């Protein structure tokens, strides 16, 4: 139906197609993850939470956290530190520390607040790195998961689910790897599509089934949505998810979410001069996931440039979100980060 806005307005119209059904929208959210301690220590943290999740705020319905590598610090350690005190007075000197302990407490407080006060039920958690003792280099940055620790890692993720559920904060989805193609200097772990396909089909998926864990398994989550330049395929989410679904068709029997991140490339970061056309990251569908009726989420997107609160920047992001919804057919969008 076409409707004229007013007698004085330019000739325009809005057409509503009631019977054109597109993808289901699972929601919109923010990631806090490694920034949980900053929000936990902020004196106006409750006002910030209201702005993000409250009825008078953005009314977001997804929160993305991290499965930290410092929960199980050795093979005998099975503690997720969920009995730590989170009711610390904001004037407490503990908030001056930048410790793993404060990060764990911060995420626990944030997740409980999101669930209990704002009734957020889409709580998703990504893993930047497995515990160091499971890694090829014995560190939480770079390296790979040792093949002999694949089942240990699957057990770790299952135990995390059960531990958080015991606190009334049931994870909706779990990702075994954040940005598997990027060896970041912070918590990180490299995976090929073949390694991830094997791990999910042989270890994580069967473990979740055996333990009756209904959480969805997120896979993909590379820094770029898609690429034009073949040499960049290792950081392309579309290539990563397409390869897994093609080479491991049995993976489709599990409860999955195919995901990607929406960062862009600048010629300035390339070691050699590259034409801008080759650095494009097209916003296109994940065809293999769509064909298999697997939801597609963008689990991280942001801007690496300085903060810009202008309407011009706001409109730029409105167009970007619109393109992901209408061109890539995503089911959810998560912004990095909620409060930094």
Please tell me what each predicted stretch does.
Residues 298-340:
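Aromatic/acidic polysaccharide-binding cleft in carbohydrate-active enzymes
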Residues 41-55, 153-163, 229-249, 314-323:
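Short, acidic/polar
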Residues 132-244, 264-283, 288:
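Active-site cleft segment of glycoside hydrolase catalytic domains centered on the general acid/base Glu
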Residues 11-171, 192-194, 202:
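N-terminal catalytic cores of secreted or lumenal carbohydrate-active enzymes
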Residues 24-32, 60-67, 122-127, 172-176, ...:
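Structural recognition of the beta-strand scaffold that forms the well-ordered cores
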Residues 1-7:
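Bacterial Sec-dependent signal peptides at the C-terminal "C-region" and cleavage site
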Residues 33-37, 67-72, 129-133, 177-183, ...:
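Solvent-exposed loop/turn segments at secondary-structure junctions
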């Amino acid at each position: 139906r076409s409707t004229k806005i007013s007698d004085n307005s330019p000739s325009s119209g809005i057409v509503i197609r009631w019977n054109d059904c597109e993808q289901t929208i699972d929601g919109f959210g923010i990631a806090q993850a490694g920034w949980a301690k900053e929000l936990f220590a902020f004196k106006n943290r409750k006002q910030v939470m209201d702005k993000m999740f409250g009825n008078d705020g953005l009314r977001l319905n997804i929160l993305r956290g991290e499965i930290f590598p410092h929960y199980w610090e050795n093979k005998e350690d099975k503690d997720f530190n969920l009995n730590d005190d989170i009711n610390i007075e904001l004037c407490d000197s503990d908030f001056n520390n930048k410790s793993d302990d404060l990060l764990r407490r911060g995420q626990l407080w944030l997740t409980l607040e999101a669930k209990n006060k704002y009734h957020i039920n889409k709580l998703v958690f990504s893993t930047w790195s497995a515990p160091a003792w499971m890694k090829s280099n014995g560190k939480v940055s770079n390296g790979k998961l040792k093949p002999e620790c694949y089942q240990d890692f699957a057990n770790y993720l299952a135990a995390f689910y059960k531990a958080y559920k015991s606190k009334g904060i049931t994870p909706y989805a779990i990702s075994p790897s954040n940005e598997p193609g990027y060896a970041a200097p912070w918590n990180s772990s490299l995976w090929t599509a073949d390694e991830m396909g094997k791990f999910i089909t042989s270890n994580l998926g069967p473990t979740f089934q055996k333990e009756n864990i209904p959480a969805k398994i997120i896979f993909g989550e590379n820094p770029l949505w898609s690429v034009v330049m073949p040499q960049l395929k290792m950081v392309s989410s579309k290539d990563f998810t397409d390869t897994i679904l093609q080479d491991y068709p049995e993976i489709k029997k599990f409860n999955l979410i195919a995901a990607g991140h929406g960062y862009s490339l600048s010629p300035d970061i390339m070691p050699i001069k590259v034409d801008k056309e080759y650095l494009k990251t097209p916003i296109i569908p994940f065809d293999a996931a769509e064909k298999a009726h697997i939801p597609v989420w963008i689990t991280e997107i942001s801007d690496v440039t300085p903060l810009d609160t202008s309407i011009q920047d706001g409109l730029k992001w409105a167009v970007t979100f619109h393109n992901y919804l209408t061109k890539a057919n995503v089911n959810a969008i998560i912004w990095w980060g909620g409060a930094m």
